[in-house]
């Protein structure tokens, strides 16, 4: 392989600060290492990113010293491109992946070790976890699923910068959608324009999230199809861009054609409720406080019989 020049998403100093925070937690818990399987954890801690993140890959973060990455051989370029690590183990499609993984863990941590692992990671199957444990008989295991995810909750200035860029792309996508909300255009027409505008505005992701109209606009998680907009249609749209996988998204209803006075009054009420809730969002305040403002006010408006959706969940 030709020499690859790394293109890190963040500075080397920021990555080292993240590893130091993880290692401090590892030492506080009197562990020898944390093994991270969540793709978000691997990328946040080491920088390593590939769109093939659904394959069997993880990072070993010892209590001190350099981390070690295990992944598929076709991803070696991305280790070199997105990280500064020279310590990694590769497997190929013909290999016994778990055997290679166990040997890699043992090479870093020795024959006996006390280790936390992300047991909740969707990329670590029950079968593979059992097999790893069976091969490393001198190891003691515990769940470490919250170690990195808790650290990721508070964003650095550099992370927020990416989220702001994603937020700008989200706004541009929504503005483009509003211009397309006229009779005769289709959901597919709107999706194409929204995707184009978000990419041009800086998003690394093309598609909108929810985009549905007519009857389907009243129900969550609808995707676009060839339905043609009609006068008085309601459209439900969520723009979901990301920059370096840092997300910003929002959802809005759009009406095709002219709104009535009653429609305007409802929208004004919703904006007022939103503003009242957002005023309460500040450090040290429980999410239940602004949540109750939304929940109780919307139910009191009488526009829905129940409101079970969660609010204020993290998407960073």
Regions found by a protein language model. Name each.
Residues 1-316:
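Active-site neighborhoods and metal-handling regions in enzymes and metal-associated proteins
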């Amino acid at each position: 392989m030709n020499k690859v020049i790394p293109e890190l998403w963040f500075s080397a100093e920021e990555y080292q600060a993240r590893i130091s925070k993880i290692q401090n937690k590892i030492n506080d818990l009197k562990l020898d290492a944390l093994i991270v399987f969540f793709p978000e954890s691997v990328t946040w801690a080491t920088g390593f990113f590939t769109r093939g993140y659904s394959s069997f890959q993880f990072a070993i973060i010892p209590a001190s010293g350099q981390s070690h990455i295990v992944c598929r051989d076709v991803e070696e370029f991305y280790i070199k491109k997105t990280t500064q690590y020279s310590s990694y183990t590769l497997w190929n499609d013909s290999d016994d992946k778990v055997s290679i993984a166990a040997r890699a863990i043992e090479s870093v941590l020795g024959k006996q070790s006390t280790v936390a692992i992300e047991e909740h990671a969707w990329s670590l199957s029950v079968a593979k976890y059992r097999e790893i444990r069976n091969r490393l008989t001198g190891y003691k295991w515990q769940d470490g699923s919250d170690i990195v995810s808790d650290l990721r909750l508070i964003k650095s200035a550099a992370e927020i910068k990416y989220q702001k860029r994603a937020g700008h792309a989200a706004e541009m996508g929504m503005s483009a959608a509003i211009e397309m909300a006229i009779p005769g255009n289709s959901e597919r027409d709107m999706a194409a324009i929204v995707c184009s505008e978000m990419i041009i505005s800086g998003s690394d992701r093309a598609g909108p999230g929810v985009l549905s109209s007519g009857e389907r606009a009243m129900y969550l998680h609808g995707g676009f199809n060839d339905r043609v907009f009609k006068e008085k249609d309601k459209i439900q749209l969520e723009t979901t861009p990301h920059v370096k996988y840092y997300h910003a998204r929002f959802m809005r209803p759009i009406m095709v054609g002219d709104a009535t006075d009653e429609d305007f009054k409802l929208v004004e009420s919703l904006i007022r409720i939103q503003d009242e809730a957002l005023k309460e969002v500040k450090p040290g305040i429980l999410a239940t406080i602004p949540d109750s403002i939304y929940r109780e006010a919307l139910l009191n408006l009488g526009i829905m019989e129940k409101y079970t959706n969660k609010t204020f969940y993290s998407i960073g």
